[in-house]
Each structure stands twice: as structure tokens, then as C-alpha cells.
Amino acid sequence: MRRLNGPRVLQLVLKEAPYIATQDGDKELEVRSDSRWIRSRLIDAGTGLVREYDFVRYRLGYQAGAPCTVCRWGGTVWCDEDITVGPYRNGFRRTFSGGVWVIVNCFFRRV
């Protein structure tokens, strides 16, 4: 979690197709397979509770100067069921099996 002028910001990197769907406002959910890495960002190690954020900042890849999209964080939930996101206008679609983390995006704005 990184603070930008005070707000709590979850920073995530996306590949091109999911980034465009998020930037366009089509993709209201960010789904991540369960892993130690994503749990370290979503779960407070001290309390074991889901962390709360003000914003989610999505970055297109790792290159310097990569475009970013910021949206208001709408919550994080655990889902034990298979889930499919998409298809979106740009054709992106993905199915996740088993336990996944679902991050709700709200109020998109471009940065």
C-alpha cells in the first residue's frame, strides 16, 4: 500500500487487454488468483483482516512512464467459486477457477 498525498492506494500492474477494459470503464471487477503476493497487499498481517483502501491505481506494464488509471476502491471480497470476467468491448475475457480475490472498482478517472 502506498500513500499519495494521504489516501491509501492499492497499486496493481495489468497487461494491455485488461488495462484497456479497466480504463474504458467496462471492467468493474479486478479478479486475482490467490497467492502469497496478493494476500500481502490485501490482508493486514497483524490483524488478519482485509485492508481498506481509498483508491486502486492500475498501471499498464512495468515500463517507466507507463499510463495509469485510478479508480475508487469499492471493496475486496473472497470468492470460492469459479468466476469469468468479460467479454468486454475489447474482447478480453478470462475464467478463474477456485478461490479468488475480487476487487470492486468504482468511479473511474484517468491520471
Predicted feature residues:
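Structured alpha/beta reader/binder surfaces that contact nucleic acids or chromatin modification marks
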Residues: 2-111
